[in-house]
């Protein structure tokens, strides 16, 4: 009988300990939940980008304002242009193109918080009538209406964009901060202190065989080869051929 009483007492102590422990844990969890509920929650209006932060296949580093001016002036941006900035970040290139050069501008930015931040900057700059910020993927959005394309991406993204850019309307101007387009040689290199950029004009595709008729002495035949903006080939007329 005594052994049974001792066993009951031990079980009672164990049960009481478990109950007290559970009560403490419950109280702690309740307090923690209350604390978390009381903590202020960050909103989209509080978002501020941090230099070097990771994005989709890129990191965000703002383009220096001095280089932005040189990029846009090299591209001869005017009020007649529509500028698309691919990977718009804080929107500064699109804003500058509108505010200083009078262009209509569109920025495409993948990060929704960054895109909203750029929209606030657009409003603060007073150019909401000229600048639109799109939340989207540069490989999904249509920017074929651009007369000028600006970008600050990564080398592999430039190469992925290259065939898209080359299929744009001949004469479209392209300016890239920091990175080139592989073996598509730039028409001009831009430097500003420690920063650099590259400028291209999308060439017309004229490779192939051409015949020019209506000339004295008979037709002239052109067989043209093309590598980006570099043109070669032969000119044939009257049984003679000349290298171009």
Model features per residue range: what roles?
Residues 79-89:
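Conserved class I S-adenosyl-L-methionine
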Residues 143-160, 166:
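A short SAM/SAH-binding and catalytic strip from SAM-dependent methyltransferases
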Residues 158-207:
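C-terminal substrate-binding/active-site "lid" region of AdoMet-derived donor-dependent transferases
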């Amino acid at each position: 009988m005594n052994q049974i009483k001792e066993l009951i007492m031990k079980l009672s102590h164990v049960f009481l300990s478990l109950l007290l422990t559970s009560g403490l844990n419950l109280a702690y969890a309740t307090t923690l939940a209350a604390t978390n509920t009381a903590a202020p929650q960050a909103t989209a209006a509080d978002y501020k980008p941090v230099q070097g932060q990771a994005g989709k296949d890129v990191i965000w580093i703002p383009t220096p304002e001095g280089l932005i001016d040189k990029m846009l002036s090299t591209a001869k941006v005017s009020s007649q242009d529509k500028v698309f900035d691919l990977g718009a970040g804080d929107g500064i290139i699109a804003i500058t193109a509108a505010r200083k050069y009078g262009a209509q501008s569109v920025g495409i930015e993948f990060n929704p918080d960054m895109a909203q931040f750029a929209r606030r900057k657009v409003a603060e700059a007073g150019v909401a009538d000229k600048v639109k910020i799109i939340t989207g993927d540069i490989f999904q959005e249509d920017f074929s209406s651009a007369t000028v394309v600006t970008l600050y991406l990564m080398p592999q993204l430039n190469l992925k964009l290259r065939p898209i850019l080359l299929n744009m309307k001949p004469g479209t101007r392209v300016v890239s901060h920091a990175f080139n387009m592989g073996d598509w040689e730039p028409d001009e290199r831009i430097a500003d202190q420690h920063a650099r950029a590259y400028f291209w004009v999308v060439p017309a595709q004229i490779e192939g065989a051409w015949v020019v008729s209506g000339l004295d002495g008979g037709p002239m035949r052109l067989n043209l080869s093309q590598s980006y903006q570099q043109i070669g080939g032969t000119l044939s007329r009257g049984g003679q051929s000349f290298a171009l």
